[in-house]
C-alpha cells in the first residue's frame, strides 16, 4: 500500500490501534499481535533505516521527474513536492495486431514495429527537452506504464543522465494522459508499506 508522507503519522497510529503497540527494528514494525509492516522510503529521499529519519525525509519537498510510457503514448513531467510544474503528453498511432496471415501479417508486424520505434524516439525527444535541463535539480526519475516502452526511451544515449536517476519504483498506470501524470505524483511521493497480518 502507498501512504502519502503527510498521512504517515496517522497511519502509524491506526496500525497500533488495529494490531496493538509496535516496536521498530529499522523500518520493520512488529506489532503485539504479530502483524508486521515494512516501510520503504519514497523515491529520491535519502536511504535510511531509521523510522524517525524516514518520517522527516518523506515529508521534505523533492523535485522528481516522471516518465510514463506505453507503446503509443508518453507523458513526461517534473513534480515539485505534490505539484506538477512542467509537463508534456504526446500520443502516436501504433497499429494493433492483425488476424491476417502470411505476408500481410509480416508486413503489419513491421509497420507496427516501425510505428512503435518512432513513438519511442519522439518520447525520448520530449524527455530530453523537459527533463535534461532539470536533471541537476531532480532527486529521482520515477517511471511507469509499459516496461519495454520506458526502457526503449531511456536507452537513448542523450538520456543517460536521467537513466542514472531512475528509481526502482515502477508505477502501474493506464494510457498516459495529463490526469494520469498528475495522479502518478502521489504514487511517486508515497511511502510504500508492506503489511503482513499475523497467521
PLM features: what roles do these ranges have?
Residues 1-199:
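Terminal alpha-helical anchor/extension segments at protein ends
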Amino acid at each position: 500500500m502507498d501512504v502519502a508522507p503527510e498521512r504517515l503519522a496517522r497511519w502509524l497510529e491506526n496500525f497500533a490501534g488495529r494490531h496493538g503497540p509496535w516496536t521498530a527494528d529499522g523500518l520493520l514494525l512488529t506489532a503485539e499481535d504479530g502483524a508486521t509492516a515494512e516501510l520503504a522510503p519514497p523515491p529520491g529521499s535519502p536511504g535510511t533505516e531509521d523510522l524517525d529519519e524516514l518520517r522527516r525525509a518523506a515529508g521534505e519537498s523533492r523535485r522528481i521527474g516522471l516518465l510514463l510510457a506505453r507503446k503509443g503514448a508518453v507523458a513526461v513531467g517534473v513534480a515539485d513536492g505534490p505539484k506538477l510544474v512542467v509537463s508534456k503528453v504526446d500520443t502516436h498511432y501504433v497499429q494493433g495486431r492483425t488476424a491476417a496471415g502470411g505476408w500481410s501479417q509480416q508486413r503489419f508486424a513491421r509497420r507496427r514495429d516501425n510505428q512503435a520505434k518512432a513513438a519511442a524516439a519522439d518520447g525520448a525527444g520530449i524527455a530530453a527537452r523537459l527533463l535534461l535541463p532539470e536533471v541537476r535539480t531532480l532527486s529521482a526519475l520515477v517511471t511507469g506504464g509499459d516496461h519495454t516502452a520506458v526502457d526503449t526511451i531511456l536507452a537513448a544515449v542523450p538520456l543517460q543522465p536521467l537513466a542514472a536517476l531512475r528509481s526502482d519504483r515502477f508505477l502501474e498506470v493506464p494510457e498516459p494522459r495529463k490526469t494520469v501524470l498528475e495522479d502518478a505524483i502521489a504514487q511517486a511521493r508515497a511511502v510504500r508499506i508492506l503489511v503482513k497480518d499475523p497467521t
